[in-house]
Structures are given as C-alpha cells and as structure tokens.
Amino acid sequence: MRFGITIKPDMPVERIVALTRQAEASGFQYGWIFDSHVLWLDPYPVLTLMASNTKNMRLGPCVTNPATRDITVTASLFATLNLISGDRMQLGIGRGDSSRRVLGKKPVGAGDLERAVKAFRELTAGREIDYEGQPTRLSWAKGSPPVWIAGYGPKVLDLAGRVADGVILQFADPDLIAWCLGFVKKGAEQAGRDWRKIEVMAAAPVWVSDDLKLARERVRWFPALVSNHVVDLISRYRPEELPPALTSFVRNRGGYDYQHHCEVESSNANFVSDDVVDRFCLVGPAEAHREKLRRLASVGVTQFNVYLMCGDEEDTLEKYKKEIVPAFR
C-alpha cells in the first residue's frame, strides 16, 4: 500500500508547499491537487511549486477533465511539468464535476474522455496526432506520464480497464470498490491486458481521534461530494445496474451548493448519515484506520489518497506518519 495526499487549493500557496514537503517527509509518495479553476486556485502553477519543493513525490491533479482546457494545452502543461519535476508527473482525469457544474455545463461523455486520454499519451510522448484535421506534435516532449482515470459508472470503469495505468475511486468502501473493480477487470480483459498491473487508488478524507462524533463531523462533507456523481449515475443507468449501497443514500438529498464544495460542516451534507460516513471515510482511533486500510488492500487497493482538507492538516500528517504509514511498509 502506497500513500498520497490531495490538497484543496483554497489556502496560501506557502502552506500548500509546506504540507507537501511534510507529507513527503512522512512517507507519502503521491501529491495530488484538486482542479476546479473557478472555485479555487489553478492547480498548475501550484504543481510547479510542489515539484520544485519535493524530490521523489509523484504529482498531479485529482482530477482534471478534457473540457476545461483543450487537450493540447493539458498535454503541453504536463510535458513541461515532467521536465521540471524529473518525470514525476501523473495525470488524474475524469468526466468533470465541480469545474463543469459551476459553469452551468455537464460532465463530458466516456467517448470524449477516451479520445482525450489517447491524444494526451501521443502528444506527451512527442508523437503526432490528427487534431481536428491538423497534424499536431509537441516535438520537444519527452515521455508520457501515467494516466489515472476517475469514475464510478460501468462505462468509465471499463474504459479505465482498457486504457489507464490506474483507476481513481472516490470512497473507502471495500465492497463498493470490489464492485467497481469488476468493470475495470472486464475492460482490461477485453483489451488483452493484465488487470493486476492497473494501479487502484481509494481516495477519502480521514480523521484520527477517539472522539468518533467529532471525527464524523470533520469528514461528513465527503459523501455529499460523492452524491453529485451518484445522482448523475442514477440519471444514466437503470436501477438494477447500480448497487443500492451506492445509490440509496442520496434518497433524501436536497440541493447542492458548489460554492461550499468540499467544505467542513457545509449544509450540503445535512442528509448524510453516520453509517455512510463510516463506509466512505476513515474515522476513529489509529487502529480503526489500519484495519480499514487492510480491508482496502485485500480487495486490490494499491494507493490510499488522504483528502487533506478537514482542518488540522499538519496534525493529520503527523499521526499518519507515526501510527498508520509504518504499518504498511
């Protein structure tokens, strides 16, 4: 099991850099950052600083999408950052949620996502593509970064199995992750790939404390975030195609205010029960975290990504350094 962090870039860049450096020193191998350019700071200048202030940590957005920026722009950004970082960049990409919704736009389709991933790979490797009828090549690009695809639905998970180096699953529910990986495995088999070589990330917030009530309140915002994707899934799939453990919790959901996206104690999360918090997040004393991580590893998770945005972030890193990470070395 490897460990990563994700930063929400709503804090001073100096603190983002300090947290990233602390995470690397604490045994975290991946440093990710949200990409929602209207709500928060643009991730790419910040990633440049993160790269300049770390030595070995692999870095990237968790996640970008094909529509916010033209794929030639994204490819050029990554090819440049790969040169700056010494080949440490990773592309996390999905259909788009907050970065699209705040503009009144919908997430892109799985077909557009697949075309973007293929173009990204070719461009960052310095190979020519046909871009809307125009031969296009980044002649100076050297080496294509690994691609992680984020998703919940069968189509995108199948796509991840066919073309991705890794899959990003935004929850820490072992049973739901096992369900998701069934589609990843199917896609890999269809493409003649060994699915066991595909990295699997579980991403979720954590709170280490004997005070379970407090811990739950610090992370309750996260299932509300997940609910946006679930509501989208329900609109596109028949009920029997989706597990009730994923869909039933949104039954009493109200509206969602993206201006309070990923915000501790946001009213967006008023409908989220303790049971869902416990399934989707990691809360409680250190041993509860270790046990949940062992269960995640048993279903195939290779990286646990801490959504580091619940307050007291330095303390969370210190607790993981001392009480969690060493158990998985």
Where in the sequence are the language-model features?
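N-terminal beta1-alpha1-beta2 module of alpha/beta enzyme domains
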Residues: 1-62, 145
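Hydrophobic faces of well-ordered beta-strands that scaffold small-molecule active sites
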Residues: 3-7, 31-33, 58-62, 89-93, ...
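Short, acidic/polar
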Residues: 11-23, 74-77, 149-162, 218-219, ...
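Acidic (Asp/Glu)-rich catalytic clusters
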Residues: 20-25, 47-58, 78-89, 161, ...
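Conserved, mostly hydrophobic/aromatic
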Residues: 27, 50, 81, 120, ...
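Glycine-rich, proline-tolerant flexible connector loops at the mouths of alpha/beta enzymes
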Residues: 30-53, 65, 97-100, 171-174, ...
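Alpha-helix-loop-beta-strand connector modules within alpha/beta enzyme cores
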Residues: 44-64, 68, 123, 190, ...
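An alpha-helical appendage that flanks or caps ligand/catalytic pockets
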Residues: 106-136, 177, 183-298
